[in-house]
């Protein structure tokens, strides 16, 4: 593939953008390709190269790049009527009504502008509602670029994971390994009266798609109930992707107190949202005392894009299509790995997928989960399938990024930039895309 135009654009970008990009995950090695346009389930770069796109904007594009007419029309109509007003509009009410009808735990919402802003506001809300300061998060979990959760360490021995964050922020953040019920019990035994909330993704979507073991979320729910703490589900990635319109919490039959949304709920435009029980969400100003505000919150173009995307998904069996393709892709990947790299692990659920370059596996794969690790104890891979973020870091992450990612790109498949970020299937993908992707995986692996 020729990449002369992308190389030239990257050189220009380096002189005016920090690192040449506006998000660190876009800085692929040796340099990123620059996208000219999207086309259905594909992207075309500045040099005219076409790729099957499994990045999908890192999750927001449930329908792909070629939007259905009803979505395009709604976006164009609201843009033509004026970009924004600094006043409420009907479409933000309609989108909130749609979400509250379909997500059982959500009675009320507050829209914001990004997943990070949603989790920042959710943490502030939990602290304000409970009158407590400490937050429990999962080791290696990611909840956006916010000071309260950019921490590393174990238990209450934590420190900021980035320069520029005061040590005092980490003092109020407690970390536990995902899927470790004993650690969850221990942190509540020691700090239960001070814990405002547990903040977790239903599935670790930013750290290798780590699926919960059976009963783990029930344990978190019970611990929060016993100690008067709130359970916050970060569904920025899984929301309206895993579990369809009921989201991952519906798939796992868990009712969190607060849910954060992003990505799909904005239909490809900048968005975030905090939802939950009315009693809690009404603590936001102006109804309550927990300050929250934003110039672009509830932006009418974003609200229209999100509403029509979700309506289209509900009316056209989008979830049936993308989930079927996801299962076919993961099953095909397992067949390839069984032959070429049996120690590697296929992970994912519904329209999410990834191959983790784990270093060990069982002697026999007979009876393994059919389409990716689901943390089933009867599966021969159960002891080897990553259960925490730490497990994923122990895989061959450098080989994945340095060798595997470029090999897939050279075969026309666009994957997320490292072993940690999830990959996604959209409604515009086809069976042919899946077959071509499997051939590329077979060659690259």
Curated annotation (Swiss-Prot):
Cofactor (UniProt): pyridoxal 5'-phosphate
Family matches, as PROSITE patterns: AA_TRANSFER_CLASS_3
Tree of life domain: Archaea
Record keywords, A-Z: Cytoplasm, Isomerase, Porphyrin biosynthesis, Pyridoxal phosphate
Gene3D superfamilies, per the entry: Aspartate Aminotransferase, domain 1, Type I PLP-dependent aspartate aminotransferase-like (Major domain)
Catalytic activity: (S)-4-amino-5-oxopentanoate = 5-aminolevulinate
Pathway: Porphyrin-containing compound metabolism; protoporphyrin-IX biosynthesis; 5-aminolevulinate from L-glutamyl-tRNA(Glu): step 2/2
GO BP, sorted A to Z: protoporphyrinogen IX biosynthetic process
Family according to the record: Belongs to the class-III pyridoxal-phosphate-dependent aminotransferase family. HemL subfamily.
Name the UniProt record assigns to this protein: Glutamate-1-semialdehyde 2,1-aminomutase
Organism encoding this protein: Haloarcula marismortui (strain ATCC 43049 / DSM 3752 / JCM 8966 / VKM B-1809) (Halobacterium marismortui)
Lineage of producing organism: Archaea, Methanobacteriati, Methanobacteriota, Stenosarchaea group, Halobacteria
């Amino acid at each position: 593939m020729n990449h002369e135009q992308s190389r030239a654009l990257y050189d220009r970008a380096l002189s005016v953008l920090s690192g040449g990009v506006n998000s660190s995950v876009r800085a692929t090695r040796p340099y990123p390709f620059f996208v000219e346009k999207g086309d259905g389930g594909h992207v075309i770069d500045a040099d005219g190269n076409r790729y099957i796109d499994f990045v999908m904007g890192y999750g927001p594009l449930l329908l792909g790049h070629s939007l259905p007419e009803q979505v395009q029309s709604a976006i164009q109509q609201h843009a033509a009527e004026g970009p924004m007003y600094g006043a409420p509009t009907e479409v933000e009410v309609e989108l909130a009504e749609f979400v509250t009808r379909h997500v059982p735990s959500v009675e009320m919402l507050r829209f914001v502008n990004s997943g990070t802003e949603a989790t920042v506001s959710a943490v502030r809300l939990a602290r304000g509602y409970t009158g407590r300061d400490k937050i429990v998060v999962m080791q290696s979990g990611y909840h956006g670029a916010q000071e309260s959760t950019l921490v590393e360490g174990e238990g209450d021995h934590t420190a900021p994971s980035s320069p520029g964050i005061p040590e005092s922020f980490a003092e109020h953040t407690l970390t536990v390994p995902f899927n470790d019920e004993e650690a969850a019990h221990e942190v509540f035994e020691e700090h239960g009266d001070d814990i405002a909330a547990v903040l977790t993704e239903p599935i670790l979507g930013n750290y290798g798609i780590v699926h919960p073991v059976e009963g783990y979320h029930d344990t978190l729910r019970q611990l929060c109930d016993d100690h008067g703490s709130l359970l916050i589900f970060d569904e920025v990635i899984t929301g309206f992707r895993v579990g369809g319109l009921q989201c991952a919490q519906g798939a796992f039959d868990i009712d969190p107190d607060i849910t954060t949304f992003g990505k799909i709920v904005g239909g490809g435009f900048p968005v975030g949202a905090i939802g939950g029980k009315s009693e809690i969400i009404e603590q936001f100003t102006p109804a309550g005392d927990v300050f929250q505000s934003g110039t672009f919150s509830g932006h009418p173009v974003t609200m229209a894009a999100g509403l029509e995307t979700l309506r289209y998904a509900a009316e056209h069996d989008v979830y049936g299509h993308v989930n079927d393709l996801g299962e076919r892709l993961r099953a095909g990947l397992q067949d390839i790995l069984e032959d070429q790299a049996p120690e590697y692990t296929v992970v994912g659920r519904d329209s999410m997928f990834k191959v983790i370059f784990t270093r060990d596996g069982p002697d026999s794969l007979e009876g393994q989960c059919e389409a990716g690790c689901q943390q089933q104890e009867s599966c021969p891979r159960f002891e080897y399938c990553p259960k925490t973020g730490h497990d994923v870091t122990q895989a061959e992450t450098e080989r994945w990024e340095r060798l595997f990612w470029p090999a897939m790109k050279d075969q026309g498949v666009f994957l997320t930039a490292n072993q940690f970020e999830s990959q996604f299937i959209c409604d515009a993908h086809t069976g042919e895309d899946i077959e071509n992707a499997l051939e590329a995986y077979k060659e690259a692996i």
